[in-house]
Each structure stands twice: as C-alpha cells, then as structure tokens.
C-alpha cells in the first residue's frame, strides 16, 4: 500500500512480488526533530522515487527492480547523527540482503531478501547482536486492514 501524509492516507497497490524482510531496531534512538532539522535531508528525492517504485509494482516487476528505485530522504541526515545505521545496513547486505535501507527517520534498518532461507539465516546472525530483530514478508494482497 502507498501510505501518505502521516500514514493515514492508504492507497492499495497491486500484489507485491515474493520477498522476505528482516528489520532491526537497534538499542539507540534518534530525535525526529534533530533528523528533520538537518541540512543533509535529501530534498531531491520524494515524488520521483515514490513514482518509480509504484510504477515497478504496477507492472509486476521483481522485488530487485522494485527496490532499486527506493530511497529515504532522511537517511543521510540520520547516518550523520548515528553512523551505526550505515554499519547496520552493511550487516544486512553482508548477510544476504539484496537491498537495505533505514526505515522512516531511523533508527530501524531493514534488509530485503529473495528467499525465506536467506532471510532466516541473516535473522539468526543479526538477532544475536541486536535482540529487537524480526522477520516478516508482505501480505499477498498488498494491503490488509486488521
């Protein structure tokens, strides 16, 4: 689903390609106001990045293609405040993720994996260092309201 505003505007999208996600919330946190006040926020992202991801989803592209257009405008600002976020992204990639990015304004980081086995293997290794680590996959209908 495409969530806009502060998450209250939800637009269903076509079904997601098959992939698995490992998400980690490190012990450290970031101040949202500090992140948003950083001059490093990449204002060039936004609509173009979102439109590329949505277009890839609508045309049934593979997860690798869908995520190749994903960007987080807050990531550079958050990494400047907490370089460990970059190390956590590297850890995801070293352990088999084909894509990794910070979630929101941080400090959570997720990795995207092409198989349950790859995600499970990474989950075990990463969780041994970061207890707040979880494994999940998108719901097949792209959006479900519970």
PLM segments and residue spans:
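Short hydrophobic/aromatic beta-strand micro-patches
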Residues: 110-112
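Glycine-rich GHKL/ HATPase_c ATP-binding element in histidine kinases
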Residues: 107
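Conserved, helical-rich catalytic subdomain that frames metal- and/or nucleotide-binding sites
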Residues: 3-99, 114-127, 131, 135-146
